[in-house]
Amino acid sequence: LRAVRFAAQLGFSIEKGTLDAIRRSARRAENLSGERIKAELEKILLSPRPELAGELLRLGLLAHLGGSPDCPGLLALREEPPEPVPRWRAFCRLTGFPIAALPVEWALRRGVLHPEAEAVRALALSGGELAALGLEGPAIGAAQRRLAAHILSHPEDNTPARLLALARAELSGP
């Protein structure tokens, strides 16, 4: 785990002989605590080369936890903000890695499994601004959830002006 982390953080390549040795002893990773695996994997995900997290799967170091060793497209991890929730969410989505297999904090698990909750907090429009449109109580929360679902698919729309326009259009009906 650490060899891959050092490669991700420090920008070097792991020699073929070292990779072969890691592959041969990969089953020993089953003896590592979930906390240790989570810590090392998260450091890789937050590094300048987060795509190397896929090496842990390809080398068999996470075979006992799940996830696909065939995980192309991990360069997309670099496009995510270098923060735990977005990087974990993308890693799990791209590899099928089960976040529930590791002892992770409740907030991280919730952010990965329920991205809409984080999207509500990230809205560029406040509940007060929705209240100014005439919404009250639970209707504000419902509108925030609908707008959050929208920005998950269309992040470019997360501006106050665009969200206000969407909320107004929804209020005026079809």
What are the functions of these language-model segments?
Residues V112-R146:
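C-terminal accessory/binding modules appended to enzymatic or scaffolding proteins
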Residues L1-P84, A122, P138-Q144, A148-I151, ...:
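Glycine- and charge-enriched loop/helix tracts that form the active or gating conduit
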